[in-house]
Structures are given as structure tokens and as C-alpha cells.
From Swiss-Prot:
UniProt record similarity statement: Belongs to the MSOX/MTOX family. MSOX subfamily.
Quaternary data: Monomer.
UniProt remark on cofactor binding: Binds 1 FAD per subunit.
EC number per UniProt: 1.5.3.1
Protein name: Monomeric sarcosine oxidase
Protein's organism: Bacillus sp. (strain B-0618)
Amino acid sequence: MSTHFDVIVVGAGSMGMAAGYQLAKQGVKTLLVDAFDPPHTNGSHHGDTRIIRHAYGEGREYVPLALRSQELWYELEKETHHKIFTKTGVLVFGPKGESAFVAETMEAAKEHSLTVDLLEGDEINKRWPGITVPENYNAIFEPNSGVLFSENCIRAYRELAEARGAKVLTHTRVEDFDISPDSVKIETANGSYTADKLIVSMGAWNSKLLSKLNLDIPLQPYRQVVGFFESDESKYSNDIDFPGFMVEVPNGIYYGFPSFGGCGLKLGYHTFGQKIDPDTINREFGVYPEDESNLRAFLEEYMPGANGELKRGAVCMYTKTLDEHFIIDLHPEHSNVVIAAGFSGHGFKFSSGVGEVLSQLALTGKTEHDISIFSINRPALKESLQKTTI
């Protein structure tokens, strides 16, 4: 294999693999390097499914990228035999007047003229008999959003990238970088590789390796769990149009998925709890009592028909920035290095669009997308660029 490429992508997970596909599609000589063999269970993309929402409770600024990402997921599905997306619709609910997340979701839908249904508590319960909410709750249902099959997404992008000439170097950890104005070099245990441009998208490992690029941004990885629960298929199955959901209730934010093919309702608790090192994280579900108890607490109150036997659990990681917004930008000192980091537990849905952004930044130094919210020089991060530690 050649040791020089047009672009090297370090970290071939959600964002990196999508970028590799976009580059290879344009005939760019591309090398993707990953410490594992994607798709795998060591990062932030496994667990079968991810929700894609367009009306975005984390900030209406995300909506254009969400819509572009949806277009690209549809395009990917046409190119591959893998199942990529199912339009389940997504339900967002919470206490009326108390949930900032629900309120921002509604404002995002209004500002961008998205198709949605607005519902009150009784209407929610009648439309989805598996859900039990108080009368003082309200909701927004987005029929055109749904569920992505995350591992299939990465698998499809990898197959298509390799078919177009991209090289994927697996089980290879990058140990160091050497950056000059007109070239980049990565050092691995298997040798050195050079390129004109570099994309760094190492997920939780960004927190450990960006310092080698003279960047010490506060990125904190957290342990995150999901559980699959035996549930009443007549109420919670995708076959009867039970939606994906993202809810803000008094004890936190939860997200979940209908049962596909009898797998059980999948539920996660969106929290930044246990700080971890990605190399030493405990990947056993249930090792902490709250792994299951936090999920049970939600099911007991809001979806009792899905509070059955735990069929399986999974452990993955979030990597959080201080403001929970992404970092997608050129390196402040090296215009031939692109950084993608800190997706803070809500990035996967955007990975098709982010891949397009990263490829554009690598090839031209700019992008057609407005990514100002993701600036590496934004106030919430700027002080941290001067060797601040977590």
C-alpha cells in the first residue's frame, strides 16, 4: 500500500467514515485509519439505532444541517443494499411550560416551517396507548423524521468508500502527528503515512490525542447505556407505528425507539454521569445499579407496558464539550488540518452531513454549510485552547 495520500482521516467512525466516503466519491486518494474495525462496539455508534430529528431541541441553528443530513441518508439508502432509515416519526414531550427542550423544538419547527403535530396530554395517550402522561404535558410529533440503523450506516459508507478506492487501515492506533504547511504525517505502530490534508475525528479519543496537535480543548468522555426491554408488541412495535421519542421529564431527558422485529423497546437516559477514559471504560451493562434503575424509573411512569424483562443492555460513550455544541473547524494553526470533535451525545444523526462538511473543509478550506456555531474559536472554548486542562 502507498504511504502518501491526498487526505488521511484519523478515526473512521460515524463522522470519519462519512467523510471518507465523500472524498472517495470525488476521486480523492483517501486513507482512513482506525484503532478498531468499524463498525464496532468500542465507540459511540453501536447499539443498532439512532434517532434523527429535524425540529431540534438543542438549538434551531441545527435544523439546516439536520435536513441536509436527512437528504444524504436517503441518497445513501439508494446506493446500498443495507437498511439505513425508517420513517417512524419522532415524538417529543414534557411538562407544558416547564420543558425548555420541548419549547425549543416547537420554535425550531415554526422557524423552519417543518411539518409537525402539536398535542396535549390526553391526545398523546389516545394516539399512542402505550404512553401514559399527565394532562399538563404537551408534545410535538414530527412525522417525517425517524430512526437510523447506525451500524448499517457506517458499514454502507465503508463499503462504498472502499469500492471507490479508499483504503481503510484497521486495528491501528495513531501515536503522533507531524504537521507542516504543505503536508501532514501520522505515526503508527505499523509505520508512517503522509498526506496533503488531515481530518481528525477520533471520537472519545480526541480527548487524549488532540494535545499532540497543540490543542487542549476540554473534552470529557462519559459512559452511556441503553437497554432493550420486553414490551407489548401491540403497543410499542414499529409495525403499529409507535414512534421514536425524545422527552424531557422532571428527572431528566430520555430517548427511545420502537421495537423492531421483537427486539423490545430500546431506551436511553441522556445524562453526563460517569466520567471515563475510553481505554479503560467498563463496558459491562449493569455493573452499576443505575444502569438499569434509571431506565426502569421512566418505564414505570410513562411506558408501563414496556417495563418487561431486560433483553439486553449496551454501553457506549458520549464526548462532551463545555457548551454541548460540536467542534467542526479548521485547526487554528494549520489550515491543512480539519477537526471534528465533541459531539456531546447528539451527533450521529448529522454524520452524513458532517462528512460532507469535513470533505469540503479538507479540499477547499471552506464549506457551503453555516458551521459558525461549531467554531473552534467560540467563546465557550477559546480560553481552553491555551493548554487548559479538564
